[in-house]
Amino acid sequence: MPESQQRFSLITDKSLAELRKLINVPIEDTLEPWCYEATRDNVRHWAHGIGDDNPLWCDPPYGAKSHQGRALAPPSFIFSLNRSFSGYVGGLPGVHAMFAGIDVTWHKPMLLGDQFTTKAWLKDLVEHNTRFAGRAIQQIYRAEFYNQNNELVAEGDSWCFRTERDTARERGTKYTEVKQKKPVFYTRDDLAKIFALYEAEEVRGNRTRYIEDVKAGDKLQTMVKGPMTVTGFIAFAQGWGGLYVRANKLAWKQLQKHPGLGIPNKFGIPDVPERVHWEDDLAALVGTPAAYDYGPERCSWMSHHLTNWMGDDGALRHLAVEIRRHNPVGDTLYINGEVARVFQEGGAHYAEITQTALNQDGELSVRAKGEVRLPSRA
């Protein structure tokens, strides 16, 4: 098959018009979430899937001694509670979806044993011109998360960019230089430096960080994620559930309901587009350098960086994340943060933190801004 032959669907004005009809319509007939409840196992699987061993999430006896009296779920656990918020986009069949960011506010902690319901709807469609694939549609969803007491726990937006796979592969320029580089290779010394950061990673825990001890310009400890491996991506999917990962009869039923979902593999078997996270060949067909990480995974790493810093008595109030590039297998991310300001609002004290995540070549992968509520000695 010639490389220039069209293999996948295009973004058309007709398909966009059909999708626009769904704006502000509640999403009801959709996949059930991976998790309904913050059980001990669900929370631990989620935390371990993002490489987070904080005992506040993973050790119920430890959590029982916290000021909440119970273990908590990490703020990013919301990704496991609603598929639409996690990138299960509707419309534009055969057009790829790249998860690209979130803007979330948390109102209450998620406690061990809490049960959740959610509401979600398509909020907007915004057209962009991109280096990755030319014409792209930013598909924005709004979601609300409620606990068993019908209390609003969190609310916010997430978005994917819908891109034409053929256009990205054949005419996209974003990764021209990356594709020309030699494959990354790590020496023992390279790995030793990465592993030293893991060894030094500090979980603040029960050593309370007070607002009086924080000032603008304070640096957060560098957090490393990687080197990226398919094994790591699968570890995340184990806690998150994936979007299209199904087996046997359930895989068949999914393709019966969504025939445009199946992309034949090298054996001629229709399989899901989520394979871009573990198959280099399909990743190349959609225009990326190699198999790459999940967007919700990377957003969760940014929140992990903040929860490590804030300690058990802090609370993440807000996080906005922009994903700027893919992290293919072999990449390593270095997450850094700095306190931008300290402020008071409604009688509570907050630190605003700006974050960046650069890969091993110094290329920007993520930028984010978070607000953390901290206790005061006063």
Where do the model's predicted regions map?
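HotDog/MaoC-like acyl-thioester-processing domains
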Residues: 1-22, 101, 106-216, 222, ...
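Hot-dog-fold acyl-thioester-processing enzymes
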Residues: 2-101, 167-313, 377
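Catalytic-pocket segment enriched in acidic/His residues
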Residues: 277, 289-293, 297-344, 355-360
